[in-house]
Amino acid sequence: MNKYELTYILKSETDEEKRNQLAEKFKGIIEADGAVENVDEWGNRKLAYEIDKRNEGYYVLVNFASSIDVPKELDRNLKIAEQVIRHMIIRIQE
């Protein structure tokens, strides 16, 4: 299994219930063929540059280990989710 780091930014006005639903959805995708090692919610932060006329976003960092198919499925779901304004999945070299 490979180790990955996922960072995603949600719209800052997303309520806590919706944030938790999305986190559980993404966690479920990962745990289907992997394991979540750490979830770190950074909260609302100023964006480095304006995205879709927004200056703030809710940052979440997830470290996980999985097969190579999971990041592809996760990427597909992150692109579909309306509340996600940006995301990035990188493989961590050991």
From Swiss-Prot:
Gene Ontology terms describing biological process: translation
One Gene Ontology CC term in the entry: ribonucleoprotein complex
Annotated signal peptide: none
Matches recorded under Pfam families: Ribosomal_S6 (PF01250)
TM regions (residue ranges): none
Role of this protein: Binds together with bS18 to 16S ribosomal RNA.
Similarity comment text for this entry: Belongs to the bacterial ribosomal protein bS6 family.
Protein name as it appears in the record: Small ribosomal subunit protein bS6
Gene: rpsF
